[in-house]
Amino acid sequence: EPKYVNLNTIHSPEQMAKLAKISAYFAGLPTLKKDKLRQCQYEAICNLESSFRQGQRRALICLATGAGKTFTACMAIYRLLTYTPARRILFLVDRNNLGRQAEGEFGTFDLTEKGEKFSNIYLTEFLRSTKVPSSANLVICTIQRLYSVLTGQELQDDEDEESTFNNTDSKRAKLAGQLHLPNDFFDFIVIDECHRSIYGRWRSVLDYFDKARIIGLTATPSEETKEFFNNNCVANYTLEKSIVDGINVDGRIYRIRTEVSDRGGQIEEGEKYTEVVKRTGEKREVRADELIPYSASDLDRA
């Protein structure tokens, strides 16, 4: 005769995978419900999870600005922490102000099984020191802050606020000696604005965590970005498509003409002006030692 056991509650997909002794990392992921998700977000998450199931370790999500990249990341991260063995995820931001925004979005995200806020379920830590709480499930920080955590070196406030976009040609930071985190500390790394954050000076920091699967978020992928993610773009939702779908509105260009933009101008002898090295973003204040005329066509030239 068949045997049965009375169940007080229905098993979750994660519990069913364990009972069936299915060891695949993503076996416990349930079918994603489209509730409250935009079509582009729904497709991005479905394609992301499918990509990981197929063995990919890096995936790029390209969503137009305004389409909800961070909300998409919140949903994807919640599902990874809830339905897979992942226990710690890093959310890399380009600057501290973006980190504070992300912390706020995770704090209000409640598209969870029971409607609880993400930060009430999983400990979310926005790093402001060189210590990572061992109990943290989601760690938010800049790559500069992550470097300070690894090496134990304190950062100056302006270093943590500096965009990595201006460091693409800088000398790479070196990781030497005893590092303070193992290379398998994070199960996943999600890189916000990934066209900025993963190259140049700080690339070695990201390369150190070679056990983690990596997810990139951007609206403007470069060829270098695509190459880093092995050309595995799981979503490509353009601005034009978002306008057609009514998520964004088309722009109107109003050209404002000034005397300088029409005819040019001049920098007087002894007048101070700022020189900017476009490649590095380096700025320095200079005093003109003679009259410097410029034409309208000289404006904004590199």
Regions found by a protein language model. Give the residues of each.
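ATP-dependent helicase/translocase motor core
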Residues: 1-88, 93, 97, 101-113, ...
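Alpha-helical scaffold elements adjacent to nucleotide-binding pockets in ATP/GTP-utilizing enzyme cores
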Residues: 76, 101-106, 201-208, 228, ...
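Short glycine-/polar-rich loops that comprise or flank the Walker A/P-loop
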Residues: 85-87, 135, 185-186, 210-213, ...
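Conserved nucleotide-binding/hydrolysis micro-motifs of P-loop NTPases
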Residues: 96-98, 144-148, 195-196, 220-224, ...
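Conserved motor-coupling elements within RecA-like helicase/translocase cores
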Residues: 124-139
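Structural recognition of the conserved hydrophobic beta-strand(s) that form the central parallel beta-sheet
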Residues: 139-142, 213-218
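SF2 helicase catalytic motif II
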Residues: 157-215
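Interdomain helical connector at the RecA1-RecA2 junction of SF1/SF2 helicase-like NTPases
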Residues: 226-302
